[in-house]
Swiss-Prot record:
It comes from the Bacteria. Disulfide bonds: none annotated. ATP binds at residues 302-307. Keywords: ATP-binding, Coiled coil, Nucleotide-binding. GO terms for molecular function: ATP binding; ATP hydrolysis activity. This is AAA ATPase forming ring-shaped complexes. Homohexamer. Assembles into a hexameric ring structure. One of its GO terms (cellular component) is proteasome complex. Belongs to the AAA ATPase family. InterPro entries: AAA+_ATPase, AAA_ATPase_domain, ATPase_AAA_core, ATPase_AAA_CS, NA-bd_OB-fold, P-loop_NTPase, Prot_ATP_ID_OB_2nd, Prot_ATP_ID_OB_N. Residues 45-79 form a coiled coil. The keyword Nucleotide-binding applies. It comes from Rothia mucilaginosa (strain DY-18). One of its GO terms (biological process) is modification-dependent protein catabolic process. The lineage of its organism: Bacteria, Bacillati, Actinomycetota, Actinomycetes, Micrococcales.
Length: 608
């Protein structure tokens, strides 16, 4: 070993393993001892080692304190969570203890509210008692009537009859609750005064009930459904309109006479019977002629009976608005579908009929023209004693008769019935004075069918460009298409035969023949109707749309594609040939009657 190496080893301090790992400072050397500030004493190895040890100890102390601070912070967080949880538990225990200590609160229903005043000497001299002068509530508690004081914390202006209040152990009202909208459903019969209403219960009995403050008595009308609290005999709330009431509150439709085709003569009859008495009532009074109270529209289905009734209502509303400019006069169309009124409970259908006419009278008294329209009239008012039903009509028919007779004093109500089986309606309904005017809505003839076709085939539809060019104009093309479709529909050729009926004319009253069978061929036109014509037009439109889509798929020019004669003729064929079954017997009998054939229908067969 050299002298230099020995000197280095002798001058270099030897530290333990822990110290070497803890300190990253360089070892002391002679060169470091010689590099000192000018004028200062050189640092010895012992002093340098002492400084390093102090630094190492300080770092260890700092790390230890950091660990202690982190531990203290974690303990503090857990302590805060524990205190919060304990506080929540204490609050729960306190609330539970308060509930256990507080006595239960009884409930009472307010019957009357009296806002009192301070007693005066004059009132004492008049032998008045605090029960008469002070603020109090008349309530019902467990079936007993009581007069109780009111806590000053309750605002008396918020208390109304019918509300529920809570009572403390001193029987003092301390908390006000809302009115309970529950109870038996009853019907308003008559409003007696500002506080009393006569109602009909479900058992048929009548009761006089008081009205809760939450119910506006001025809005109550005869026939309204309300809830009755049987404990206090108080009406608490109004029940929304029932299904039958919603049916009769339909406003005026927008159908006009111009939208009905092929029924010009029938429409003229109806307008003369309905509109003239309304427009010129003074002339009818001079002649002592009462306007008709009812109209019966009968005939095969699908020929516009419902549309006529709607047009009557619309026309009356327009006339009323013209006669009373600036007023709020409007028309109402009460559309009643017969089967929807039938109910399994006895008396329920009759009640709904009463509701209908109550609504009609209310609107009429306000000056509004009202049309009460009974569709499928035979379903409700069948002939009594016919044995064709469960005899439910024995009470329904008299109810309608009473209501129609009650409309006599009203000037703005007219009843319109529609049926395709007038032979099933009770004769008392059909007699003059109830349904005065009876109009048969026949199937359209060829001219009427062309008029109906014109309502559905308009100039704004896309038409076949070839046919438009050949006709010279859109209007001319439409006229040609309609003529072709109507001609095909009413053609009487073997290809358009629809049914063959065998009739025994010997069954005619007065005929002495034993048997006289005859066959009659019925054609497509014998079963045409407005609904059938609309279906034909719809089929033609679908065929034109399909043809246009095929042209677009093939990449061809589809601008010239539109409804053409070929589509209409194919639609006429498909409308009847796609029906596998023969027409129903009532339709066949009706077609034979129109053709003047009388007798008993023996059989019906498809044409050969």
């Amino acid at each position: 070993m050299s002298t230099h190496e020995s000197a280095d080893q002798a001058g270099t301090p030897q530290y333990g393993t822990a110290h070497s790992a803890a300190s990253a400072a360089p070892h002391y050397s002679a060169a470091f001892g010689a590099t000192s500030l000018p004028g200062s004493q050189p640092v010895s190895a012992q002093e340098y080692d002492a400084v390093l040890r102090r630094l190492s100890a300080a770092e260890a102390t700092r790390d230890n304190m950091s660990r202690q601070i982190r531990g203290a912070g974690e303990k503090n967080r857990k302590l805060v969570e524990a205190i919060t949880s304990m506080r929540y538990q204490v609050e729960r225990l306190r609330a539970s203890l308060s509930q256990n200590v507080m006595p239960p609160l009884n409930s009472a229903i307010v019957l009357a509210v009296h806002e009192g005043q301070t007693m005066t000497y004059e009132q004492v001299a008049d032998d008045k008692t605090p029960a008469e002068i002070d603020t109090y509530l008349d309530v019902q508690v467990s079936g007993r009537m009581m007069r109780i004081p009111v806590s000053p914390l309750i605002d008396l202006s918020t208390l109304t009859p019918g509300m529920t209040v809570l009572l403390n152990d001193k029987t003092e009202a301390v908390l006000a609750l809302d009115t309970e909208p529950f109870g038996d459903v009853v019907t308003v019969r008559e409003v007696l005064d500002e506080q009393r209403v006569l109602v009909d219960t479900s058992s048929g009995a009548q009761q006089v009930a008081r009205v809760a403050g939450s119910l506006n008595i001025e809005q109550l009308r005869t026939g309204d459904a309300v809830t009755l609290d049987t404990r206090t005999r108080m009406l608490t709330s109004q029940v929304p309109a029932s299904r039958s009431q919603e049916l009769v509150l339909e406003e005026i439709p927008d159908v006009t006479y111009e939208q009905i085709g092929g029924l010009g003569a029938q429409i003229e009859q109806i307008r003369d019977a309905v509109e003239l008495p309304y427009l010129h009532p003074e002339i009818f009074e001079r002649y002592h002629l009462a306007p008709p109270k009812g109209i019966l529209l009968y005939g095969p289905p699908g020929n516009g009976k419902t549309m006529i009734a709607k047009a009557v209502a619309n026309s009356l509303a327009a006339r009323a608005a013209a006669l009373n400019p600036g007023s709020a006069t409007r028309g109402y169309f009460l559309n009643i579908k017969g089967p929807e009124l039938l109910d399994k409970f006895v008396g329920e259908t009759e009640r709904q009929i009463r509701d209908i006419f109550v609504a009609a009278r209310e609107k009429a008294e306000a000056g509004h023209p009202v049309v009460v329209f009974f569709d499928e009239m035979e379903s409700l008012f069948r002939m009594r004693g016919s044995g064709r039903s469960s005899d439910i009509e024995t009470t329904i028919v008299p109810q309608l008769l009473a209501e129609i007779d009650g409309v006599e004093s009203l000037q703005n109500v007219i009843v319109i019935g529609a049926t395709n089986r007038e032979d099933l309606i009770d004769a008392a309904v059909m007699r003059p004075g109830r349904l005065d005017l009876k109009i048969r809505i026949n199937r359209p003839d060829a001219a009427g069918a062309a008029e109906i076709f014109g309502l559905y085939l308009t100039e704004d539809l896309p038409l076949d460009a070839t046919e438009v060019a050949a006709a010279g104009s859109t209007r001319a093309a439409l006229t040609a298409m309609i003529a072709a479709a109507a001609g095909q529909l009413y053609a009487r050729t073997p290809s358009t035969a629809y049914a063959v009926a065998t009739v025994d004319s010997s069954m005619v009253v007065g005929s002495g023949a034993s048997a006289n069978l005859s066959t009659h061929t019925l054609y497509r036109g014998d079963f045409a109707s407005g609904a059938v014509i609309r279906n034909i037009v719809d089929r033609a439109k679908k065929a034109a749309i399909k043809e246009q889509l095929q042209a677009l798929t093939a990449g061809a020019d589809a601008s010239s594609v539109g409804i053409g004669t070929r589509h209409l003729l194919e639609a006429v064929r498909a409308e009847f040939e796609d029906q596998v079954d023969l027409p129903p017997l009532p339709d066949i009998e009706d077609a034979l009657t129109v053709a003047g054939v009388r007798g008993r229908l023996v059989s019906v067969e498809p044409p050969r």
